[in-house]
Amino acid sequence: MWIKGKAWFNNSIDTICIQIDRFIKNIKKDCKPDIEFKENQLILPASIDMHVHVRGAQLSYKETVATATSEAAYGGIGLIIDMPNTLPPVNTYERVIERIREFENYSRTDFGIYSGVTKEIEKIDTLPIAGYKIYPEDLDRTETKVLLEKSKKLKVLHPEIPLALKVPRKLRNIWMEIAALHYVQGNVHVTHITNYETVKIAKELGFSTDITPHHLLVNGERDCITKVNPPIRDYLTRLGLWKALFEVDTVVSDHAPHSKEEKNLNYDLCPPGIAAVSFTTPFIYSLVFKDLLNIERAVNLLSKNPAKILNIPYGEIRIGYVANFTIISKNDWKYRTKFSKVTETPLDNFPLEAKVEFTIVQGKIAFDGKNVLPIRGVNAFDKSSRYPV
């Protein structure tokens, strides 16, 4: 199949034809396209979200693989990586295999999964996973030290020391975030950083980094809807974090859904988490349309850099790479979730200028501007089902 339209290709915008099946087979100037996108629509490499809590399994009342990945496709994301803290947790050989099968059956986007810290490192390391997630409570564990020494796979760090989980939320200070960096070494990615100092030190230590939109935009923790880990920081800290948008490697959603009943509990009892996986892509490209960010930086943040961190052939319009695309237009609208089980977020009604018109996954339309189609994504880390390069 041939598609044609304006595209971000070779570091510029040009009208090109792209031949696709599951992969990008050819790129040239002209063709007789099967699909031709409108003049006001722009073809981009599909976004990659390295930090999504899909839930499912015994937590399906919060969110399922189908609803989370449908919401991701609606937000222009072609690949999500799932966190292991569902129920039961994904931290054994058997649970990793079960989790992969759950995604194979129900995912509307391509996917990868992280394992939790485990005693079964040698067995799990043989499986097609994205890497491992290290939580604050893991930092003092012997298994974490073994993991850091033995596994070459990516380790994603929640940057807070164990003490942060034992003190009142108002005392979960920035120094606890910075101190956590010194517990780890090697192939480490530091996620949902909340302040600029942590970004600088993490980069000095050779780690890749990300931030979330809500740590930039949400005006303090006012209630259960805005409660999140790590906590939303004060105004000046959030203002400083905007500098990080030009230095971090990627932007993630940290999509963390909970039921309405859970979010209606007393503030001290309600679980933390904001679920807006579909917000990140239109938000970042809205900054481009506002001339606050250039398009090359936006594509690097959402597509090219996460693919490099994960060491997979995604994130670029390039022959041999996976045929995942986001098609956007300049269009004023106000944000709402659409396919997620979560219907209320602190980002609701946020004004955006970029709108996702289509999401293409594995060469097939996953989101057509109105509906998510019943396609099946693949495990981006399973080389047997992946790509020819």
From Swiss-Prot:
One of its GO terms (molecular function) is zinc ion binding. Signal peptide: none annotated. Pathway: Pyrimidine metabolism; UMP biosynthesis via de novo pathway; (S)-dihydroorotate from bicarbonate: step 3/3. The modification N6-carboxylysine is found at K133. The active site is at D254. It is an enzyme of class 3 (hydrolase). Substrate binds at H53, V54, R55, N85, H258, P272, G273. Binds 2 Zn(2+) ions per subunit. Its cofactor is Zn(2+). Its EC number is 3.5.2.3. One of its GO terms (cellular component) is cytoplasm. It comes from the Archaea. GO terms for biological process: 'de novo' UMP biosynthetic process; purine nucleobase catabolic process. Keywords: Hydrolase, Metal-binding, Pyrimidine biosynthesis, Zinc. PANTHER family: ALLANTOINASE. Catalyzes the reversible cyclization of carbamoyl aspartate to dihydroorotate. This is Dihydroorotase. It comes from Sulfurisphaera tokodaii (strain DSM 16993 / JCM 10545 / NBRC 100140 / 7).
